UniProtKB/Swiss-Prot annotation:
One of its GO terms (molecular function) is DNA binding. A master regulator required for the expression of late competence genes including comC, comE, comG and the bdbDC operon. Receives signals from SrfA, and possibly other regulatory COM genes, and transduces these signals to the late COM genes. Represses transcription of rok. May repress expression of a few genes. Induction: Positively regulates its own expression. Expressed only in glucose-based minimal medium during the transition to stationary phase. Expression is initiated at the time of transition to the post-exponential state, and exclusively in competence-stimulating medium. Repressed by AbrB and Rok. It comes from the Bacteria. The keyword DNA-binding applies. It comes from Bacillus subtilis (strain 168). Pfam families: ComK. GO terms for biological process: establishment of competence for transformation. Disruption phenotype: Transformation deficient. Loss of expression of at least 165 genes. InterPro entries: ComK (IPR010461). This is Competence transcription factor. Keywords: Activator, Competence, DNA-binding, Repressor, Transcription, Transcription regulation. The gene is comK.
Amino acid sequence: MSQKTDAPLESYEVNGATIAVLPEEIDGKICSKIIEKDCVFYVNMKPLQIVDRSCRFFGSSYAGRKAGTYEVTKISHKPPIMVDPSNQIFLFPTLSSTRPQCGWISHVHVKEFKATEFDDTEVTFSNGKTMELPISYNSFENQVYRTAWLRTKFQDRIDHRVPKRQEFMLYPKEERTKMIYDFILRELGERY
């Protein structure tokens, strides 16, 4: 993994190569350390700002994605979020997103994780690199499983495995009557 030594970037959007967005203090200011498959670099934005910007880049906002997670899973504390549904980019926070120490991990890039001697978690990423994160093993495991559940629920919806709810469709009374009449005729025609 190469280390970029250039000046920090001013902005960034999470993408398929993003492994983690972690807080890093630079000159007394919280910035972000971006870990991608092949490189590490810094951005002059807080991790949550990058996550929100990335959600907006893909047509929503952090608040919108957080609300979407709640609608699907009822997870409200440290919810994982879907940044980009078309590219299967799901992130989960290491702590409460309101805390400046909160980092974000890309679910798809987590290959293995284990507890360390001091109750942190050592994570092996898809690029083969390992990193120790200041999060307990149980908390990290919980975040991984909750994100997997969110991914599965969204994928089921995308694959149409969840029945569509017809009550959201509003039709004028005449059309409803005709639809019911047509349905009855079809059912009777199939039976007789």
